[in-house]
A protein has these predicted regions:
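Conserved alpha-helical substructure of the radical SAM core
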Residues: 55, 61-199, 203-204
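Cysteine-cluster motifs in flexible loop/terminal segments that predominantly coordinate metals
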Residues: 392, 396-443
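Short acidic, hydrophobic short linear motifs in intrinsically disordered regions
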Residues: 39-55
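Short Fe-S-cluster ligation motifs
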Residues: 135-153, 393, 429-457
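Radical SAM enzyme [4Fe-4S]-AdoMet core and its adjacent flexible, acidic
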Residues: 217, 221-233, 240, 244-348
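C-terminal accessory region of radical SAM enzymes
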Residues: 301-335, 365-412
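Acidic, low-complexity/disordered tracts enriched in E/D and polar residues
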Residues: 1-36
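Non-cysteine beta-strand/loop elements that form the S-adenosyl-L-methionine
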Residues: 198-216, 278-286
Length: 457
């Protein structure tokens, strides 16, 4: 399988199974529209006749021979070596957990998938005992795995920060007895951050996610406080302070959401960069199409163009010798990550689960509140192994649309929650998400290919 596209004045060709990327000329691009394996010894006469209106016949024949040579060398149309790994996609030890430390929030974001923080379950905070049981559950279910991840999530975790501190202390106390090493992450809207919280986060948290949508008018349209006022002016000083004090060996990024109201989101990325934030993630809102802020199919041409604009802006910054990292343009063309991760992505419901303040267990934070996906409870000791096994097998070869898609090894089958919520089944591709993901991948592939081309010259 191959995928080719035009972008930024270049023609790109991706060999899907090997991950090889090539910059090709117009003749090769057009010829590949007309030939595919199994190849004849010579270029078919009807193809030569068709393309000779635009290209020299000898050039067409030479180009065909080169394509066949690359095919014989397993560089183009390479065989799928990944499907065999799908047989290894069995239920795995749990190694990561999203801990819903607070089902409450001090913001009322209009697009919030979590019903403004309580996930439709009533506002509550996780107590220490529930959090402790969750840590014990993770240790018990992790098998021989040493590195465990805990994401403190909400709602807004800073509303229950004392419990966060106690649970970090408890988890650390369990590392040596169980030969484990915890890595903590916290996601915060920044409104309630104090200097003491910042110091604790920068000491204990392996990663921190800072939620902001970009320009003041964009952020404050959707990310409002309980009284309806904006949050931008309150959070910017807090985020700047946290990032300035953060150790260089620890991760962080600002994470935004764009909606129909700011389809010029490249300006929000650049605004965040100009504020001093060079680790940036901005994602499309996922919402019911009836919502006024929802992104629909009609918005895709504008969104695609905006990603192209963003890639040009980022490339300009890098050409000036400066650093910026946009998470959705990060791509590994060197056969990484591991095969199983390429096939089933984040591991929700299998290697990763979420725990609510009352001890309920779900496949991930976006499934919380969907009764049919409740996997168990920490207090009654239940856990649905059959559901865990179902998620373990929810890889790209068991998703009909994904199996034949060129992007499958990069999106890994997409978000299971979005697939269920918007396409009716975790095995069904959510087409809107897919199309946006493919465009981001094309931009990322082209940026990487052009960089390699420049390095070779």
């Amino acid at each position: 399988m191959i995928h080719k596209f035009k972008l930024g004045g270049f023609n790109a060709l991706l060999d899907v199974n090997s991950g090889g990327v090539h910059i090709i000329d117009d003749l090769t691009y057009d010829l590949l529209d007309n030939v595919e394996p199994p190849f004849e010894e010579k270029c078919p006469e009807d193809v030569v006749r068709k393309l000779s209106k635009m290209y020299d016949s000898k050039d067409i024949e030479d180009c065909y021979e080169e394509i066949v040579s690359l095919y014989n060398d397993k560089i183009l149309f390479s065989e799928d070596d990944y499907e065999k790994y799908a047989l290894s996609a069995v239920a795995s030890p749990i190694k990561a957990m999203c801990l819903h430390i607070a089902h409450d929030c001090n913001l009322r974001c209009k697009y919030c998938f979590a019903s403004t923080g309580d996930f439709g379950q009533g506002r509550m905070l996780m107590d220490y005992e529930t959090g402790k049981r969750a840590i014990d559950f993770l240790i018990e279910r992790s098998g021989d795995g040493k590195f465990l991840e805990v994401d403190f999530f909400g709602g807004e975790p800073s509303l229950n920060f004392g419990t966060v501190e106690k649970l970090v202390e408890y988890a650390r106390s369990q590392e040596e007895p169980h030969n484990k090493k915890f890595r903590f992450t916290v996601t915060t809207n920044g409104v309630h951050l104090t200097d003491e919280m910042i110091d604790f986060i920068n000491k204990e948290m392996y990663n921190v996610v800072l939620s902001i949508d970009g320009r003041k008018e964009v952020n404050d349209r959707m990310r409002v406080r309980v009284d309806g006022s904006g949050s931008y002016d309150r959070i910017i000083p807090n985020f700047k302070k946290l990032v300035e004090k953060r150790p260089k060996n620890k991760d962080w990024y600002v994470r935004g959401t764009y909606t129909k109201y700011n389809l010029d989101f490249s300006n929000d990325v650049m605004h965040l960069y100009d504020l001093g934030f060079d680790q940036i993630s901005v994602e499309p809102v996922m919402a019911d199409p009836s919502e006024p802020y929802a992104i629909t199919e009609a918005d895709l041409p504008r969104i695609f163009k905006e990603y192209e604009i963003l890639s040009e802006k980022i490339q300009k910054i890098r050409d000036e010798g400066k650093f910026i990292n946009f998470f959705h343009f990060m791509i590994d063309l060197d056969q990484g990550p591991c095969a199983i991760k390429r096939l089933r992505g984040c591991g929700s419901g299998n290697e990763y689960v979420s725990v609510t303040p009352d001890g309920d267990i779900y496949p991930c934070h976006q499934f919380v509140g969907i009764t049919e996906f409740k996997m168990g409870n920490l207090y009654d000791g239940t856990f649905n192994e059959e559901m865990k096994d179902m998620f373990a097998h929810a890889h790209v070869y068991n998703k009909p649309e994904c199996k034949k898609c060129w992007a499958k090894f990069y999106c890994s089958g997409g978000c299971n929650a979005n697939n269920y919520i918007y396409a009716g089944d975790i095995h069904n591709a959510h087409k809107l998400s897919c199309q946006i993901q493919k465009k981001r991948l094309e931009c990322a592939i082209m940026m990487k290919a052009v960089k390699m081309l420049d390095s070779a010259e």
